[in-house]
């Protein structure tokens, strides 16, 4: 899990840098049989997980005509989907006092409510959102 999120973070950093030079970058979340997974996949499912099912998505993401950047594409077994990391609207406690674990518990349903979630574009954008909420109003 952590290594995969590191890849997404790295992709987001490269996306911002690459944009300046007309370079696109993506991440593939493959659904394919590998040496690591072949012992845990049912034998009747294994033929569906050919790596070749992933290559079409990789080729499209690398194509010059594809102007998108920073996408995570799940690909394999004949299935393809864009995947997003999303951020809930969250809960603002303010900066006057540090919240207690009990306060987090009491408002956790608000913290975890994904009904107004938005794509988590990158850390800089997430920080800007937080700073806009907590900045003193002039």
Residue ranges and their predicted role:
Residues 8-9, 15-30, 66-75:
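Conserved Rossmann-fold SDR core element
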Residues 27, 45-137:
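C-terminal helical subdomain
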Residues 18, 23-43, 81:
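Flexible, glycine-rich beta-alpha linker
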Residues 6-9, 53:
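Conserved cofactor-binding/catalytic machinery of classical short-chain dehydrogenase/reductase
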Residues 3:
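Active-site helix of classical SDR
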Residues 11, 15, 37, 58-59:
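Generic hydrophobic alpha-helical scaffold/packing signal
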């Amino acid at each position: 899990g952590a290594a995969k999120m590191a890849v997404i973070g790295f992709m987001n950093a490269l996306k911002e840098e690459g944009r300046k030079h007309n370079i696109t970058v993506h991440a593939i979340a493959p659904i394919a049989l590998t040496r690591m997974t072949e012992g845990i996949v049912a034998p009747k499912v294994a033929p569906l997980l050919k790596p070749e099912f992933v290559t079409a998505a990789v080729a499209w993401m690398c194509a010059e005509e594809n102007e998108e950047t920073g996408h995570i594409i799940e690909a394999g077994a004949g299935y393809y989907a864009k995947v997003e990391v999303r951020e809930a609207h969250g809960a603002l406690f303010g900066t006057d006092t540090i919240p207690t674990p009990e306060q987090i518990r009491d408002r956790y349903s608000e913290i975890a409510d994904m009904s107004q979630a938005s794509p988590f574009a990158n850390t800089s954008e997430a920080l800007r959102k937080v700073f806009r909420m907590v900045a003193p109003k002039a």
